[in-house]
Amino acid sequence: MSFFWLFPFLLHLSFADSLSPLSAPVQNFIHLNHSCPSSILTYSRNSTYFTNLKTLLSSLSSRNASYSTGFQTATAGQAPDRVTGLFLCRGDVSQEVCRNCVAFSVKETLYWCPYNKEVVLYYDECMLRYSHRNILSTVTYDGSAILLNGANISSSNQNQVDEFRDLVSSTLNLAAVEAANSSKKFYTRKVITPQPLYLLVQCTPDLTRQDCLRCLQKSIKGMSLYRIGGRFFYPSCNSRYENYSFYNETATRSSSPPSLPPRSTPQQQLKLAPPPLISERGKGRNSSVIIVVVVPIIALLLLFVAFFSLRAKKTRTNYEREPLTEESDDITTAGSLQFDFKAIEAATNKFCETNKLGQGGFGEVYKGIFPSGVQVAVKRLSKTSGQGEREFANEVIVVAKLQHRNLVRLLGFCLERDERILVYEFVPNKSLDYFIFDSTMQSLLDWTRRYKIIGGIARGILYLHQDSRLTIIHRDLKAGNILLGDDMNAKIADFGMARIFGMDQTEANTRRIVGTYGYMSPEYAMYGQFSMKSDVYSFGVLVLEIISGKKNSNVYQMDGTSAGNLVTYTWRLWSNGSPLELVDPSFRDNYRINEVSRCIHIALLCVQEEAEDRPTMSAIVQMLTTSSIALAVPQRPGFFFRSSKHEQVGLVDRLSINTSALCSVDDASITNVTPR
């Protein structure tokens, strides 16, 4: 009989003995999971690497190590035998528990991963990690682990299940923002319901804010939120939710700001399956949980309905009011994210003028900073707006369901007295129109950045149309509604006009025409017909504006005569074989001809007169990312302006109203029109 299988165990014992003078006897800590990703990258017992590893682990588990922050890094040896390691303790545990957990994990490391150069060990109270590579200040997704309760949520009502997932997802994502903006990169949150929901998120403190947030968001997406509890580990971050307090609430009380309490009033409870048995070794511990789902905030919805009814009696308008759709019940999705007005008022310094970021069609936008350091954009709807209450409800309903890097994220809302406020993530670089239409700012966006922005907008619209759980038509895509993040990443904003489509719905009609002049498709402006192809038309206009730095609403000259608006002007350049004359002079000497030409071609396909001729957003994304895809020949665009002032102006002359009444010119977002 071979005794080869005993070698790792004997090595583990001898290694543990060599560290025993450095560590006092410790309690047992339950091993949740481990990762030894490579069987190729190994070392031998007599190697320099093993000597360096012992030095590293002795340093990390030493009583002289600093456990006050719950995080420590160390390096031992020189390349190519250098070892880098770290430990991360859960943010609420004491120094003593942290020290003991690290010492315990050091003793166990060779039991779980003998001879491996790259190792991650996960325990409930701590994580130990080391590698032959530099792992400091770097996000790592290899070596992940997921632990889920074995029982699904038991409910015959799918809406209740979805509402539970929305509650957990939205609260975890809000906690992720708080953690990313804190120095400790740790945050807990307790949602007050009849049976409380507890959440915890944490990153290694050496990560940047952006890396921490991205890591946590990825971990949240990695969990199946149909279970009644679970957790997800990456070497760089972790997230967890339960219905019982699994962390030290006293130690974390300061991390949960009293200014952001959930305001939902649950009306029903969800029946849950009984929890399974807990496995202690190797398989991880399942969560024994019973979770309550917050169901619609009936009072809040009734408040909206009552308010709409009163205004309908008081105010007569020249258009037919559309009833709120069935999706209005979903405003409760964001119920757990309702903000307290006093907290928002304090964050914006009582809506101080110096904090004002801008003004939109329905109100003003302010920058706010909460005591935790989180920066937000606060959209305060005007109290005198005759239309804002509808858009407020619509925006909460729509945006609360969306999570995509190319969409501005809704953090919460406030509805107190006559105040209607939306709280968004803060996007520092203003909107796209601030750059492309300003002669002094245009040079900051070279072609590489503009091409990236075009791709980001396309992916964001594709998510709305196809990849999200809902099919959403934005209806107000324009340069002013594209915000730019830290890395000039495009984020679509302002969902006040958006409409949700049913599963098999492809188009809809409305007598309430809303939008911005120059971006609206012909069939929408004339007949109130809108579909995904309406957004495609707007996207095409946006692409032409990004390439040219010109507004579509202006009239341009060609050969000494009027060439019409930007769409018509581009079509004439294309027909004459000189489309590159459209390029913004600020980057004319530094761009890829094939990329610009292809983008102009795609834009002309998007603004074709007939909706069925326009490509879908999925096709557009493929066209942008795959140069080998052949492009169709574009047909004449909608709203085509002829060169002679005596000739008809295409579709525009069929409208029974003047274009000045059709809609505003770029700086406002709403118009009411009654077509024939």
Curated annotation (Swiss-Prot):
Sequence segments annotated as region (Disordered): 252-279
Domain of life: Eukaryota
Boundaries of every Protein kinase domain copy: 351-631
Binding site for ATP: 357-365, 379
GO MF annotations, alphabetized: ATP binding; protein serine kinase activity; protein serine/threonine kinase activity
Subcellular location, principal: membrane
Signal peptide residues on this chain, from the entry's feature table: 1-16
Family: Belongs to the protein kinase superfamily. Ser/Thr protein kinase family. CRK subfamily.
Protein name (Swiss-Prot/TrEMBL): Cysteine-rich receptor-like protein kinase 4
Organism: Arabidopsis thaliana
Species lineage: Eukaryota, Viridiplantae, Streptophyta, Embryophyta, Tracheophyta
Gene that produces this protein: CRK4
